[in-house]
Amino acid sequence: MSFSNTNTGDKIADPYKEKNSDVNVTIKEKVEDLTDFISACKFGMMTTRVGDSGALVSRCMALAGKESGGIDLIFHTNTESGKTDDIDSDSHINISFLNSSGEWASISGTASIITDTAVVERYYHPTLKAWLGDLGDGTHDGGPHDPRIGIIKVTARTATYAVIKKSAISRVAEIAQGVTTGKAASVNKLREISEQEVATWRSSNKMVE
């Protein structure tokens, strides 16, 4: 099913997407530019679905690591928080990133909660103690063996992102020209990484590993 509110005939209904889509790019360049952008942002919004209501909930999360050549994302979590309940009920997830220049990325996939001690220790950082606290019972101390510390691994399925391809002055001029002429502004490199491209990238990195 799709939504449409009008018929533009033989005219392109979404000229912005047509003008900014960057399709002649290798999978390697697509993924590497995406992962560089994500690493620079560091903080993203994680969106999950609440099991009993179906409501979408987002919260800010700090990137803790990347796997599969950068396409799969790692986050710390308190296993007793609401987001782990959401993921246990529905593993579908979205992670989005945005910077002050208007560049953005959206990764759609599935999430898994990992409590394996070796994995937790691999990604553990002492600053986690500031978020979990020390409950004073000798077990829940915010350290690497605190059973409340888990890992959320986001296995990417698809990704869409936009990075800027022109200077700020050029973008302003392009937008002004668009307002005057009615022609869509060309200001971003709008890229999509398909499910097949994600699978290809993940497989190629497994062979390297």
What are these regions, as identified by a protein language model?
Residues 3-15, 35-40, 56, 89-99:
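Short N-terminal helix-initiation segments at or just after the protein's N-terminus
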Residues 20-43:
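Short, basic/aromatic recognition patches
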Residues 27-31, 80, 129-130:
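Charged, amphipathic alpha-helical segments
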Residues 39-41, 70, 90, 145-149, ...:
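Short gly/pro-enriched beta-turn/loop segments at secondary-structure junctions
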Residues 40-47, 131-136:
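Short Pro/Gly-enriched beta-strand edge/turn motifs at strand-loop
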Residues 42-79, 85-88, 93-99, 104-112:
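Short beta-strand segments
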